[in-house]
Amino acid sequence: GIYRDPGHLGTAHPFLALTAVLERVTPGQYVALPAFGSGADAILLRTTPALQAWQAKRRLAAQAERARPLPTYGHFLSFRRLVDGEKIEPYSSLMLAWREQESNLRRKAHRCQACGQIHFPPHNVCPKCQSRAEFAKVRLSDRGTIVTFTCDRLAPSPDAPVIMVVVDLDGGGRMFTQLVDAKPDEVAIGKRVEFVFRRFHEGGGAVNYFWKFRLERRG
């Protein structure tokens, strides 16, 4: 069940519980979403026929199957910050996060109007034809193919090694970022991956999120 498997997830938990309920109800039913903390509130929702199309997509059970058990108790302690590890000091700021939200959160890239090249992160000069022509904003595809990768055993991480991948995205564009939920022996050039939105680091006094990849799984 939702309380037995992931445990209580804090702020996100009511919405996860709502998702679990919406997987079982039918159009036209009422669903109450209560939440408590410093006070309490509740939202009353009514399902519509659009629910059935949503239910045909990925379900919570399929998402739970992606979970990878931690190899050792030491990994658990490290993730919970109960043991000291190598310190990292990431930098960020709310101003920077706001200014770059289109690329960092919405995955908006630039398409060169002169040669059609898609590049991410966006630049004011096309890296292919060096044109300074107008650029169109396009959203990067959800999936792509690994071009090359590396397993970094020196970068500070509670779950070493850190797997970094270069991915050619469907429809154009290339991105370099971290691969998660995978072991080094599961990664290979040519494997298909998909984007996931994950916690990145704590910098500038705030939690920062960014896009990472995981191995593609259908269904």
PLM features: what roles do these ranges have?
Residues L33, F195-V196:
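A generic structural signal for residues embedded in beta-strands
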Residues I88-T145:
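Cys/His-rich short segments
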Residues L154-V166, V207-F210:
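Short aromatic-glycine-enriched beta-strand elements
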Residues G1-K87:
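Claisen-condensing/thiolase-fold acyl-transfer catalytic domains that form or cleave C-C bonds
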Residues A188, V196-G219:
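OB-fold/S1-family single-stranded nucleic acid-binding modules
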Residues D181-F195:
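Short nucleic-acid-contacting surface segments enriched for D/E, G, S/T with interspersed K/R
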Residues I163-D170, Q178, K212-R214:
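Short, acidic/hydrophobic/Gly-rich beta-strand patch recurrent on exposed beta strands
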